[in-house]
């Protein structure tokens, strides 16, 4: 009996060792690429991205490798966001989450059943490194809303850019609760970092993204999007024991809008939306810009507002219009003449006895024509003698 137990324990120990090896091993599908190339070959993962330069959409796409982005929340929206940025060749991704992958997450995109039980940041880092080994992946497995961890989060986003000691270029919020959004808002206001807030509604049929520039646009404490759009208190949305709905379609669309605007900001092309919503029921995409609240509860937001107001505002360029006296069209086949607005209008001479006072005819009516006279005139013009109708009938019968 003891021998069988020892054998089982040995098998269990062997399986544990194998499992740990699988957890720590990272698959590398290809060698790292030092420089992006626009060469159109099957082995170049960046050829389709670099084509944006050839089509004059982006001036220098390779600058994306100099950018560092922090993603807070690696769930339905955050994991897809990280996947898209990795495929786009971002320089560095910093992932924050403290949750684990569960089978209940499988209705969303990105994660697979064999990753159940792993921390989300660990599972994401393995998959992303396999997709694109050129991207630097940094993970942080803790809750940013606690006092101790908030300080670590604050330091990380302010000093963990690609250059040591430099802040990240952009922060993307993909969390699902009010407290985490407020923590990100406070950290970005304090560090004066631009960031995107994103979210999907509890019923899974609407989403939004909001680009927040401290001092210039409303921060999350100034006007939370759901409070503005639907008059809902966001603190009531995340409730214990209540299962929120989720659709991979809504998650994917929201993540796509988020990454699209992040790329436009990082690579300086197109127009970045300050607020962009999505309603899946009628495919409605509202846009708006929210001004900061002068009485915001966040003291760093008020400080950034003062700094923004003190900056010299760019002057609008006035374009001088060149006015030419020459006619726009030299030819005038139709004899059209331009008349000044103050030119006198010729009055019609038509009899207007039946027209009410203060009115005039729009055109001159033709004179009434006597049909009998016109017929007789036609006969004369035809050179025929004037003959009565009875004579004509008699002539026809005699023929």
From Swiss-Prot:
Keyword Membrane attributed: no
Could you tell me the keywords of this UniProt record? Answer: ATP-binding, Metal-binding, Nucleotide-binding, Ubl conjugation pathway, Zinc
| Listed GO biological process terms | neuromuscular process; protein ufmylation
> From what superkingdom does this record's organism come?
Eukaryota
InterPro entries with a match to the protein in the record: D-isomer_DH_CS1, ThiF/MoeB/HesA, ThiF_NAD_FAD-bd, Ubiquitin-activating_enz
As one GO molecular function, the record gives: ATP binding
Q: Which Pfam families match?
A: ThiF
Q: Which residues form the active site?
A: 243
User: What residues does ATP bind to?
Assistant: 76, 97, 120, 143, 177
Question: Between which residues do disulfide bridges form?
Answer: none
GO CC aspect terms? cytosol
Coiled coil: which residue ranges?
Answer: none
List of residues binding Zn(2+): 219, 222, 296, 301
PANTHER family in the record: UBIQUITIN-ACTIVATING ENZYME E1, UBIQUITIN-LIKE MODIFIER-ACTIVATING ENZYME 5
For this chain, the family text in UniProt reads: Belongs to the ubiquitin-activating E1 family. UBA5 subfamily.
Quote the function comment for this protein.
Answer: E1-like enzyme which activates UFM1.
Q: What is this protein called?
A: Ubiquitin-like modifier-activating enzyme 5
Species of the source = Drosophila mojavensis
């Amino acid at each position: 009996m003891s021998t069988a137990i020892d054998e089982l324990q040995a098998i269990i120990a062997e399986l544990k060792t194998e499992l740990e090896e699988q957890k720590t091993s990272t698959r590398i599908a290809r060698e790292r690429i030092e420089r992006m190339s626009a060469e159109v070959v099957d082995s170049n993962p960046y050829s389709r991205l670099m084509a944006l330069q050839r089509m004059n959409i982006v001036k220098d796409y390779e600058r994306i490798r100099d950018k560092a982005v922090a993603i807070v929340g690696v769930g339905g929206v955050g994991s897809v966001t990280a996947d898209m940025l990795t495929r786009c060749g971002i320089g560095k991704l910093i992932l924050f989450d403290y949750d684990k992958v569960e089978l209940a997450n499988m209705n969303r995109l990105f994660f697979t059943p064999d990753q159940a039980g792993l921390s989300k940041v660990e599972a994401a880092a393995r998959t992303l490194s396999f997709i694109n080994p050129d991207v630097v992946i940094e993970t942080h497995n803790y809750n940013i809303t606690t006092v101790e961890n908030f300080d670590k989060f604050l330091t990380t986003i302010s000093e963990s850019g690609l250059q040591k000691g430099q802040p990240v270029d952009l922060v993307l919020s993909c969390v699902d609760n009010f407290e985490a959004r407020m923590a990100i808002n406070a950290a970005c206001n304090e560090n004066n970092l631009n960031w995107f807030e994103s979210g999907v509604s509890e019923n899974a049929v609407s989403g939004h993204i909001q680009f927040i520039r401290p001092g210039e646009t409303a921060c999350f404490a100034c006007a939370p999007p759901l409070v503005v759009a639907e008059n809902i208190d966001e603190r009531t949305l995340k409730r214990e024991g209540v299962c929120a709905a989720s659709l991979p379609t809504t998650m994917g669309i929201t993540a796509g809008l988020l990454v699209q605007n992040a790329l436009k900001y990082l690579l300086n092309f197109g127009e970045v939306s300050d607020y962009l919503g999505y309603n899946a029921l009628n495919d409605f995409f509202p846009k708006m810009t929210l001004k900061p609240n002068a009485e915001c509860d966040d003291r760093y937001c008020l400080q950034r507002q003062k700094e923004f107001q003190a900056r010299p505002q760019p002057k609008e360029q006035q374009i001088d219009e060149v006015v030419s006296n020459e006619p726009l069209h030299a030819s005038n086949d139709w004899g059209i003449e331009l008349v000044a607005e103050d030119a006198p209008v010729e009055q019609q001479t038509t009899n207007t006895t039946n027209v009410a006072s203060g009115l005039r005819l729009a055109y001159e009516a033709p004179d009434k024509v006597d049909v009998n006279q016109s017929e007789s005139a036609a006969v004369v013009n035809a050179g025929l003698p004037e003959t009565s109708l009875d004579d004509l009938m008699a002539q026809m019968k005699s023929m």
